[in-house]
């Protein structure tokens, strides 16, 4: 077997798309490739993927976490096209060192961070508290929070409020974008971002924790590997501790958690190559092998029996494996809550990748543009006026109309 790295999964997906479209210089599809469901679905629509049920028995497939394996069934004929190999969900990570200073001064509690609305309230308090540290300089408060993967904010936020933002039937999507519910998402991300309570500067929010620009974020469980051990700014550096919390939910909503992570697809070829590819996937997802991979990656195992902290501890002890402390604590937390967790991910549909990108960038780009407008204000009165304008009902209506149009344009005629 030969393996090839294309950098990130996104880079690999680009290479797969180029292979499908026959781009000049593109390589043939590999026997096995890592893929998110959106891309694998597009490849399957071109009839290029192997139905894995030809090589996996019902008994073998029953060992995988139900919601994970269901993600790979793209059609109504019980054909399986994507096998889960590692998954993740979202958690909240906090710079404990700076949180403790703030909490001691203001009486704030980690319990307040259980809901998105609570995060917004704490973030406002944090901004005002840090602003007060420099009484001779106005409006220099610091942001408290950020989040990775804005699409997850929409998808899981709407699900927690009782709606599927992408409702799919027969590969066709209906957008459930109830204006009042979307307004709640706007009020709890866009508005605090514009006011400076939230922020996003680096590629990932763990980068922003490292530079001291925020002290808390919602991100993938695998991001714990990258949570910094210290804050480094232009004029200081100091060590920090950490806290791992459940990702906040919409107040009053159901406690659904994001299910995410790439799977493995097998390209249609001949029986020999397809069989060998599936045997490799069986080996890779065996409990012991999968748990060893989890130790190195921070992802979650895909077999039911492997999602057990005792099984992980056994593998670590027997193999004398060194595991990142933050990643271990995060995985332990998720595993201990696994049986009671409701995971959720969207179903696949044509142009789903493009629609998801609208969720990823539409609101966050608008918030970033408005925040820059606020920062450019020349005085306090101008600043207040800009914030009022950018966060008004009229501003929301204008954004909402553009957001709705962008989603429709992303999927085209269905």
What does each of the following model-derived ranges do?
Residues 1-38, 207:
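Early extracytoplasmic/lumenal segment of secretory-pathway proteins
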Residues 10, 31-91, 135-137, 239-248:
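Hinge/lid segment of periplasmic solute-binding proteins
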Residues 31-34, 215-220:
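Paired acidic/hydrophobic, glycine-rich loop segments that form the ligand-binding mouth/hinge
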Residues 54-65, 108-112, 138, 144, ...:
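Short, solvent-exposed loop/beta-turn-alpha elements that line the ligand-binding surface or hinge
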Residues 74-85, 90, 117-174, 214-216:
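Extracytoplasmic/periplasmic solute-binding protein
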Residues 120-127, 168-202, 242-247:
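Glycine-centered hinge/linker elements that transmit conformational signals in sensory
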Residues 194-195, 233-307:
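Extracytoplasmic/periplasmic substrate-recognition and gating elements
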Residues 321-414:
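Conserved C-terminal helix/tail region of periplasmic/extracytoplasmic solute-binding proteins
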């Amino acid at each position: 077997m030969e393996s090839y790295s294309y950098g990130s999964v996104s880079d690999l997906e680009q290479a797969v798309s180029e292979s499908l479209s026959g781009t000049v210089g593109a390589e043939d599809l590999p026997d096995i490739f890592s893929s998110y469901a959106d891309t694998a679905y597009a490849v399957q629509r071109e009839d290029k993927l192997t139905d894995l049920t030809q090589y996996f028995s019902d008994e073998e497939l029953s060992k995988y976490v139900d919601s994970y394996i269901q993600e790979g069934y793209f059609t109504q004929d019980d054909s399986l096209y994507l096998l889960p190999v590692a998954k993740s969900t979202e958690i909240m990570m906090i710079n404990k060192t700076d949180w403790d200073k703030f909490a001691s001064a203001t009486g704030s509690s980690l319990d307040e961070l259980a809901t998105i609305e609570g995060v917004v309230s704490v973030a406002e308090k944090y901004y005002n508290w840090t602003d007060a540290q420099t009484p001779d300089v106005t409006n220099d408060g610091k942001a408290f929070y950020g989040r990775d993967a804005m699409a997850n904010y929409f998808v899981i936020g709407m699900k927690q409020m009782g709606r599927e933002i992408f409702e799919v039937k027969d590969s066709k999507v209906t957008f459930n974008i109830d204006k009042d519910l979307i307004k709640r998402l706007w009020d709890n991300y866009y508005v605090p971002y514009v006011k400076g309570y939230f922020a996003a500067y680096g590629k990932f929010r763990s980068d922003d924790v490292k530079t001291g620009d925020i002290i808390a974020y919602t991100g993938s469980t695998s991001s714990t590997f990258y949570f910094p051990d210290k804050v480094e700014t232009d004029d200081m550096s100091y060590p920090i501790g950490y806290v791992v919390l459940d990702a906040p939910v919409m107040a009053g909503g159901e406690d659904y958690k994001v299910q995410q992570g790439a799977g493995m697809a097998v390209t249609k070829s001949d029986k020999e190559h397809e069989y060998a590819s599936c045997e490799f996937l069986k080996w890779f997802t065996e409990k012991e092998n999968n748990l060893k991979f989890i130790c190195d990656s921070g992802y979650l195992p895909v077999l039911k029996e492997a999602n057990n902290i005792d099984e992980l501890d056994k593998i670590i002890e027997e193999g004398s494996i060194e595991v990142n402390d933050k990643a271990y604590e995060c995985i332990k937390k998720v595993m201990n809550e696994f049986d009671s967790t409701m995971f959720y991910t969207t179903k696949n549909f044509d142009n789903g990748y493009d629609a998801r990108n609208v969720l990823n960038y539409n609101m966050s780009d608008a918030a970033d543009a408005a925040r820059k407008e606020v920062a450019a204000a020349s005085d306090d009165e101008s600043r207040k006026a800009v914030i009022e304008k950018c966060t008004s009902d009229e501003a929301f209506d204008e954004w909402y109309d553009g957001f709705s149009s962008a989603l429709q344009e992303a999927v085209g005629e269905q």
